[in-house]
Amino acid sequence: MTELFIDGAWVAGSGPAFASRNPGTDDIAWQGASASAADVDRAIMSARRAFADWSALDFESRCAIAKRFAALLNERKEALAAAIGRETGKPLWEARTEVAAMAAKVGISIQAYQERTGEKRQDMADGVAVLRHRPHGVVAVFGPYNFPGHLPNGHIVPALIAGNTVVFKPSELAPGVAQATVEVWKDAGLPAGVLNLVQGEKDTGIALANHRQIDGLFFTGSSDTGTLLHKQFGGRPEIVLALEMGGNNPLVIGEVEDIDAAVHHTIQSAFLSAGQRCTCARRIFVPQGAFGDRFLARFVDVTSKITADVFDADPQPFMGAVISARAAAKLVDAQSRLIEQGAQPIIAMKQRDPRLGFVNAAIVDVTNVANLPDEEHFGPLAQIVRYADFDEAIARANDTAFGLSAGLLADDARAWEHFRRTIRAGIVNWNRPTNGASSAAPFGGTGRSGNHRPSAYYAADYCAYPMASVESAQLTLPASLSPGLHF
């Protein structure tokens, strides 16, 4: 099998064999050989050779290829959505939205480059001040499994249109989606060496991250891995490092008139994508008293009816499987640890089959857990915290080293003003789910949730560096000389 894409051609990997599986059926979705360290080196050197011509190509020509990529994505939407659903378990309805987001990213990235970077000129008394932006060179892109098309695409598209060349290492849990995506780039006319694909597991990633010929590393994934990368590159200021990581995100419920609307947004926040969005709400803050009791009862009632099924089921389910049987078992174990620490299960999570990734949406009350662990449980496990007053809710919501997303559901505009001023997060929503984000806005967080704003509008900032020039078309001796100079 030819599973690697190096220097414009599909080639076989020379590393160990591995496979991805459909988490809803346990069928093999993709199999092949991983990239060895030598394969990774070939990919990086191919990108290095391609950089001079690609970066010298005019911006409009680079954008034309990206636009062709977007058009082909739309033409192949159903096939790509099926590939995403097969490897991740997410339902087709949601996988289709991922492909649409991939295509839309091209126009957003082009606009972002022109508005945030690009070229600007300002006249001076004796010349012109010019601000240009230059690509870094060869950048490594590490993709996650939860959005294996959309999230790495949010690094790759702005990197390419800025003039960088890319070596892409996708998640080992979704290699088939990466292969299909790179095939679209190839068919869009991307020159050889500009985008290279190295498949593999941990050793492949280490070989790529440790290579001395990369100029940047753009990562979307877990906070633990991102933190290790941050430590690794701490002594290398020449490497641009963009990290988008996880969050222990809070959603605060106020006393609202429309309880069903609040329950809907809470379910979307906690359980969309089977809870496998980095912006999903992990901690739900519910007021004590009669209103909180009514809200919680309705939340439990609707949650108990949520269906989970295979990605191509008819009718379509709200949730699919989580990424693997192992991930499902880890979620159940996380719930058990919380219960051991004093949490009360309201809807207990169970794994349907030990071979599969199906778990039900779960709700546990952690109000009485004395030292609630500041951990991201990446799945449909909602933790309820009952609060006495609004300031207590905000204080406990901010009691985290993360800072990705936060939300408030409240009718009171004054409560919102107070919330947005005091909450600590990069994405803060009012009467919208925590995982709702505008593609035209920066995406990312503070603290252990990462740096920069990858995968969205502000990606242009880390895909090119500013180069300032003072220019004059004519070389002339100044009319006024500095003291001590004689001509």
Swiss-Prot record:
GO biological process: arginine catabolic process to glutamate; arginine catabolic process to succinate
Location of the active site: 244, 278
GO molecular function, one term: succinylglutamate-semialdehyde dehydrogenase activity
Enzyme Commission number: 1.2.1.71
Binding residue positions for NAD(+): 221-226
InterPro entries per UniProt: Ald_DH/histidinol_DH (IPR016161), Ald_DH_C (IPR016163), Ald_DH_CS_CYS (IPR016160), Ald_DH_CS_GLU (IPR029510), Ald_DH_N (IPR016162), Aldehyde_DH_dom (IPR015590), SuccinylGlu_semiald_DH_AstD (IPR017649)
PROSITE patterns referenced in this protein's UniProt entry, alphabetically: ALDEHYDE_DEHYDR_CYS (PS00070), ALDEHYDE_DEHYDR_GLU (PS00687)
Broad class of enzyme this protein falls into: oxidoreductase
Keywords noted in UniProt: Arginine metabolism, NAD, Oxidoreductase
Catalytic activity reported: N-succinyl-L-glutamate 5-semialdehyde + NAD(+) + H2O = N-succinyl-L-glutamate + NADH + 2 H(+)
Lineage top rank: taxon: Bacteria
Involved pathway(s): Amino-acid degradation; L-arginine degradation via AST pathway; L-glutamate and succinate from L-arginine: step 4/5
Family statement drawn from the similarity comment of this UniProt entry: Belongs to the aldehyde dehydrogenase family. AstD subfamily.
Chain's role: Catalyzes the NAD-dependent reduction of succinylglutamate semialdehyde into succinylglutamate.
NCBIfam families, per database record: arg_catab_astD (TIGR03240), PRK09457.1 (NF006992)
Name of the featured protein: N-succinylglutamate 5-semialdehyde dehydrogenase
Gene it is expressed from: astD
